[in-house]
Structures are given as C-alpha cells and as structure tokens.
Curated annotation (Swiss-Prot):
It comes from Flavobacterium psychrophilum (strain ATCC 49511 / DSM 21280 / CIP 103535 / JIP02/86). InterPro entries: GCS_T, GCS_T_bac, GCST_C, GCV_T_N, GcvT/YgfZ/DmdA, GcvT/YgfZ_C, TrmE/GcvT_dom1. One of its GO terms (cellular component) is cytosol. This is Aminomethyltransferase. SUPFAM superfamilies: Aminomethyltransferase beta-barrel domain, Folate-binding domain. The gene is gcvT. Belongs to the GcvT family.
Length: 360
C-alpha cells in the first residue's frame, strides 16, 4: 500500500483512511454530507496525489497524443488543458485523462490512479515515434482546492490571477512561496476551483499554507467519499464504474470528446458506430420515491425485464433524492423515460433526466 506525502497529516486530522487504487487515502473527515456542503458553498481541499502524471516531450509528442486519444489535441495552445480518453482496439476505453499543453512539444497527461501502469504500457506500446516519455506519478502531489470561494481564499498565495482564470486553463508559477507549481482551473466537483501539482517534498509546506490562507473562508479537508457525491451530482464519469474497457465513448455520452477529423486508435470502428447509432446509452436518472440506487443494482422495465445496470448511484446531498447513472437500451434513453431500479426485490420507479443533476 502506497502513502501520499500527506498521509501523516490526514491521520493526525482524524481522517478515516481506506485503501483506494493501491493507496492509503482519506475517505472522510467529519462526514460526507458536511464535506459535500463545504465544497458546494465554500472551499475544501482534496488530496488526490494518487493520480498519475506522465510527461511527453519531443517533436512527435503531439503526433503520439493524437494517435492514442479521442479528442483533438492539435486545438490546444500553451496553458490550456483538454479532457479526453484513450480508446482501445475493441471499442472500449483504456482510461479517461486530462492533457495539458505546457509548450510546443511538451505535454503533461494526468491519468486515473488505478490505471497508471496500464495507461503507461498502452501509450508506450504506441510510441514508435521516439517521443521522450517520463512517468513522474510517484514524484508529484496533487491537491484539488474546490468550491466557489477557492479563488478568493487562495489569491494571497500567488500572483497568478485566480479569479479570472478561464476554465481548463493553467499556469506554472509561484504558489505559497514555492516555484514551478502548476495551477490549473480544473476539477471534478462542478463547484469551480483549482488543481495544483507540485513535488512531493513541498507537500506539507503547501498544505499548511493553503489552510492558513483559507482559514478566514472556513476551508476544510475533504475526503474521497464527498468527491464521489460531488462528481455524481454533475454526471461526471468515473472510470471503473461508468466507463471501462467495454464501454465506448459514444455509449457513455463522450461523443463531444471524440473527434473524427483525425485518425486515432479504433476511430474507424467508432465512426461506424456513430453513423449506425449505439444500441445502449449511459443515462442519468432520479428516483421518484425515497430510495438509494447503488452500483450494480439491476435496471428493469415496467414488466420487470432486466434492461441494464446501475453504474453509479447515491443519495444526493444537495438535492436529497436518489440519483444514478446506468446503461440502458437506446429506446429507454430519452429524457422522462420511466425505468425501474431493483432494490432488494422491489422495483422502484425512476425517471431519465438531463445532466447535470445539480443546477447551481
């Protein structure tokens, strides 16, 4: 089991620690609902240092990225980031990731913790272009400072203009007195904020300065359980639940990051799938009575026939209703369609809705 550079701090704060993707991670501090509310209304900090960071350099770096990812990275300018995925050869997804363009011929790829080795091997196997690849996942820490008060709370720590930083842009500069910190206007919560990347040896110093600066704003540490409820209220996919090596980006509602004006892994088959239409789709649904849908619960039709499976589900802390995502036949995927979730032998009515669940 790996620790992050901040494990001792989490333990000293009384965090409940659990194994996640091979790491000892804080799942909650004072409680999921309270932590969720802090991020929706104020500012909270997640240690997500388990995520992976790959650096690609060289004149063919973009060509390699274009070959293995579904989105069009040629559209990136320096200081911009892009959400994308790594399609496999079978019509599924190796991983979803964020691509950062640091400069021409210099990129950072941020991948899911559970897929670091798999992604590294996958991209390496396609690197016949002489691209210099470095896996620095074990050297970098990552904090997500999220919430509507994040910019204001952190502004005293940097000369980077946080308030006016466009979504999915980033700058590398001084933060909390440390140089070469990557400050990115990204996140997995839907409440705004930043993700900051820095060397492990700076982790405790940065953590302490963040909490000092954020104290007047009621800043709190947040665990992975609230990270999950926050992302689910936005309908953001979680790899391993909502997307995996058998789900196509088109089935998962990720057509917007699948660009067919270039060739990439399995693009011909995915293009054909787009033209012919998909047989199943990932839908968002809200329970119509008080009930909590959970991962792997069956989705059934009005006659009780199993038509799909819940991939993610929870009781929404912001809305106080059961919400979830799951794959159903395309005929059940239109908004307002009635579906039923099988919860301990009871089939409970749910309605297909448009994302996000949580409207600010």
């Amino acid at each position: 089991m790996k620790n992050t550079a901040l494990t001792n701090i989490h333990e000293s704060l009384g965090a409940k620690m659990v194994p996640f993707a091979g790491y000892n991670m804080p799942v909650q501090y004072e409680g999921v609902n309270a932590e969720h509310e802090i991020v929706r209304t104020g500012v909270g900090v997640f240690d997500v240092s388990h995520m992976g960071e790959f650096f690609l350099k060289g004149e063919n770096a973009l060509a390699l990225i274009q070959k293995v990812t579904s989105n069009d990275a040629s559209k990136l300018v320096d200081g911009k980031a892009q959400y994308s995925c790594l399609p496999n050869n079978e019509g599924g997804i190796v991983d979803d990731l964020i691509i950062y363009k640091i400069a021409d011929n210099h990129y950072m790829l941020v991948v899911n913790a559970s897929n670091i080795e798999k992604d590294w091997n996958w991209i390496s196997s396609h690197n016949d272009l002489g691209v210099d690849m470095q896996n620095l996942s074990d050297s970098y820490s990552l904090l997500a400072i999220q919430g509507p008060k994040a910019a204001e709370a952190m502004q005293s720590l940097t000369s980077i203009d946080l308030v006016n930083m466009p979504y999915y842009s980033f700058q590398i500069g001084e933060f909390a007195g440390l140089k070469d910190v990557t400050v990115s206007a990204t996140g997995y919560t839907g409440s705004g904020g930043f993700e900051i990347y820095f060397k492990n040896e700076d982790a405790e110093a940065i953590w302490n300065k963040i909490f000092e600066a954020g104290k007047p704003f009621g800043i709190k540490p947040i665990g992975l359980a609230a990270r999950d409820t926050l992302r689910l209220e936005m309908g953001f996919c979680l790899y391993g639940n909502d997307i995996n090596d058998t789900t196509s980006p088109l089935e998962a509602g990720l057509g917007w990051i699948t660009k067919f004006d270039k060739e990439f892994t399995n693009s011909a088959n995915l293009k054909k799938q787009k033209e012919e239409g998909v047989a199943r789709k990932l839908v968002a649904f809200e329970m119509q009575e008080r009930a909590v849908p959970r991962h792997d619960y069956e989705i059934v039709d009005a006659s009780g026939n199993v038509i799909g499976i819940v991939t993610s589900g929870t009781m929404s802390p912001s809305m106080n209703i059961g919400i979830g995502l799951g794959y159903v036949p395309t005929s059940f995927s239109t908004v307002d369609s009635d579906i039923f979730i099988r919860i301990r032998k009871n089939d409970v009515l749910a309605k297909v809705v448009k994302l996000p669940f949580y409207k600010k």
